[in-house]
Every structure is written in C-alpha cells, then in structure tokens.
Amino acid sequence: MGRNLGSAFRQELANLDKDPDSHKTAMSNLRSIVKDLDAKVVHVFVAQLSDVKEIGLESGGYTVSLFEDLARAHGVKIAPHIDIIMPAIIRTLSSSEGSLRVQQACSRAVAAMARYGIDPTTPEDKKTNVIHSLCKPLSDSLIDSQHQQHLALGSALCLKSLVDCDNWRSASSEMVNNVCQSLAVALEATSSEAKSHMALVMALSKHNPFTVEAYARLFVKSGLRILDLGVVEGDSQKRLLAIQMLNFLMKNLNPKSISSELELIYQEMEKYQKDQHYVKMAAHETMRQAERLICEADPMFDAENCKPRNSLSGSVKSTSSLREHDGSVYSRQDRSYVNDQDEYDVLFSGVASGRTLVSGSPLVTFGDNNQETGFVIESPRIGDQIQCSGVENGNIESVWFHQRNRSSEFNESVCSRTNRSRSSRRNTKKRQSGDICSKHHRHGFAQDPFTELLDNRQQLLQYSETSSSSSIYDTSGTTTPTNTTEDICEKPKTDLDSEAKLKTVETELDPRLGRSKGVLKLGLSVFSIAVAGFASFMWMYLQDDMMPPHLVPT
C-alpha cells in the first residue's frame, strides 16, 4: 500500500510543473489522497513528502501546503510527525529564493499544525512539546542563517504565525526567551530585509510582554537603525514598520524598560513630520505616546525643547521664557513644591479692597537693588507683574515671608488711619460700635456676629429717640453726603437707622389701628344681635298664618 501511494504521489507531484490544467488536476488529486489517508498510512505519506529533495520553485509552495491539508484532515494524529515535517519546511524556505508565496505557504502550514495538532484534552506537557518542536528549528534558523537572508525572513514569518496562534500560550518561558534572544541577534545583524523580524517583535510584545522587556532596549535601538536605513534606501514601507514597532513597544511594555530611550524616540519622530502621509501619521502617534510616557516619568519635561524644564513654574516665572501658570512654586535646590494659593489673601489684601495698586503699595521695595535675578512675581488677582531684583532662586521662600510681613504691616496702618478718621466724626458710643465692626472687618467685608448686630440695633433705637444729630438722614428725608474715607461697615448702620425710624412710625400708628378695630368688632356684634332678634320675632308671629286650615267634619 505504501508502494502504491508513493508511485501515485510522485506522479502527481511531477504534474505540478506542467501546464495550468495539469497543475489544477494534480493539486486536486493530491488533496484527495491526503483526505482519504488512513491513520496507519499517515507516517508513510509524511515520510515520502519529506524525502522529496528536488522541488521546483513553482511547486514548492503547493507541496508544503499539503502539510496544512494533512493537519486539517487528521488533527492530533500529525503531532508525532512534526519532527519529520519541520526539516522539510526549513529546506523549502532555503530553496525558495525569497518567494513570498512559498514563505506564506510555510507559515500557514506551521500555524495549522500548531492549531490542529493540539487538542484541548491534550496534557500540558505534550502541548509544550508540540510548540517546542515547531519553534526550535525556526528559532535556530534566525541565527544560523545570517548568510541566507531568505531562510531568515521565512523563519521570522513562520514564527510570527506561530506566536499569533492561540496555542502559543503553551510555550515555555525558556522557549520564548530563546526566540527573543535569537531575534535580537538577527535584528542587530540584518542590514536591509527586516520587515518580518519587526512583525515578529510586535507579535511577541503583544503576547509575551514580560519576556520582551529584557530585550526592549535592543529592539528600540535596532528599530531606530532600521528607520535610518529606510531613509537612506527611500523605503517608506520599512520606515512605517519601524515606527509601528517602536509604538508597539511603548504601548505594550513597561515604560521603565525603555525609559532611557524615550527622549531619543521623541526626537527621532520629530524628523518625520513632513514625510509621506501614512508615515507622518504613524510618527505623530508614536511621538505623542513617547511624550505621554516621558511626562508620566518626569512632570517637568519640556516637549518644545525635549529636555527637563529648568525654570520655575507657577506665579514665579522665568523672564527669558514665561511658562504657563500651573498654580505652584517649584524650587530646584530643595525640589519642593510651595502652593501659592495660601499667600493670596495676605499678599494682596490691599488690592482686594480696590483702593490700592500693587505698584503703589509698600510691597514693592526691591527697586533699590542692583542685581537682576531673572524672574517676576505675577499678581493672581489683577494680573500685574512685580519685578523682583536681587533675589536668588534659593531664597524664594524668604521673599514670600518678607512680603507677608510687609503686607500685614500695611494692612494695620490702613486700618489705623480709617479708625482715626472715623473717631473724629462720631461720638463715644458710635466709636465703640465702630471698633466692634473693625474688629471683624477683613478684605472690605463686614463679618458681624448675630449678637453684636442685635446690640447695634438696640443702640440705634436709643439714638433715634434721644439725638437727631447723630442720624445721617435729615428731617427732609434726603441723605447727606458722607466722607469717602469712612469704613464700609457704616453702610449696615445706615440701614439699621432707617429701619428704626420706620419702627417708631409703626408704634405711633398702632393705638389708632387698635381703636378702629375695637369699634368695628363692637358694631359687628350689635348688628348680628339685631338680625337674630328680628328673625326670631318674624318666626313667632308669622307661624300661625303659615299653617294650613284644619278640615272639620259636619
């Protein structure tokens, strides 16, 4: 039976190199032979197919595709014959002369054996052995065939199809590490043809990121070198694959494994912003990915100059190039952040009242110094900038401390002047109430507690009865102009005074209203009594007239 199979098989193989009609007939007959094979004859067919040494270039891909059909038809029964099939595939790749059709046929055969040669009920050790039998010859071909580029490219393509298979998860960590090691050496040694190698790197970084992290820097350097080769050779497809490989590594691997290469990737991607459209879009996406990873590792990274920023950020800005305001002060010497939100109310309390400008306040006293520091202090309230001269970067905290002391002294002097002007126009009782108000005055807002508000109201009621000179309203009802230097806490007292006057008018009208209400109630009660009496009278005297007459029998 094996002899008859061998003769028919060789005859059909010979017909593959003939005219197209004979070729189609031969392939149909060969596939029929594969499907009709008995399980006991599979090893004979595999041995005869593997022993074919002289296969034409055109028929090589079709011959290897029979292994794919054999795996689909017989499943796990092909697993014991993988050690015989793989040398035939390696030999076919060596003689393919770079034919993409033959390489794709070999990759499909490897993927089919990995998929159908392992059953879900297969023990884990047997699954690992099957993957090892498929992977080991291909991994060795990446290194041993550096002088044979066709074999290396075909092996890389077959390995990619194997890695993308679902059963690749059964591969041991040692096997994955050997593949990564061979791939790193092959990428370093290859000069021009490396597209299949870069595709294999992307597949491994997707399925085995933890193992690839040990070789991440080598892959990045190889990718950048291949990117430069793509520029020299004018190969846009090679540039695109190299950029995609770098992007895959940054997306799937731990950023710490390639942290030292991120800035280099960013700088290289900037060179391809004017390349062809699809290359430019891939470079832009990769550059944004690199920038995001760099910013996560170094928040002070400057994307414009691609270096860490040396200037202070926040309300203290460099005069050479003012950065965007980020709400914090950063000191380079002690590398500590100082939040400037706490300094707003103290440093710019005079600005909040609207009566003091920053340039005219005693806060700016640095003009007499001769040294120039190179930073300005920006007002967060009105946007003015205060030039600070003669202050070193390391003494920025002391500057804030002196500014806070000066602002507190300035506030005390302003409050004392307003209190003195108020005391000259008020009597003793008004001065006491003004002191209570000034005690709770801050930034021009009155903050009187409820009890003090009641005391002020009672005092104003007494003032309205005893002295008319203390009221700011004239008898004609018009208001007198007040001095502009009076404190803002007088405004609530004027409202209280007007309320007190309204209350006195209401108290004068209360007796009249009470008497009128009493008379109205008395009239209504008398009227109701009269109506009730009239109704009872009419009911008593008209009842007899309303009764019908009684009939008396005669």
Curated annotation (Swiss-Prot):
Top-rank taxon, per record: Eukaryota
Coiled-coil region list: none
Basic and acidic residues biased stretches: 322-332
Gene3D superfamilies: Leucine-rich Repeat Variant
Pfam families: TOR1L1_N
Region (ARMADILLO-type fold): 17-290
Any one Gene Ontology BP term: antifungal innate immune response
Keywords: Immunity, Innate immunity, Membrane, Nucleus, Transmembrane, Transmembrane helix
GO molecular function: microtubule binding
Recorded domain comment: The KASH domain, which contains a transmembrane domain, mediates the nuclear envelope targeting and is involved in the binding to the SUN proteins.
Quaternary structure and partners: Interacts with SUN1 and SUN2.
Protein's name in the database: Protein SINE2
Native source species: Arabidopsis thaliana
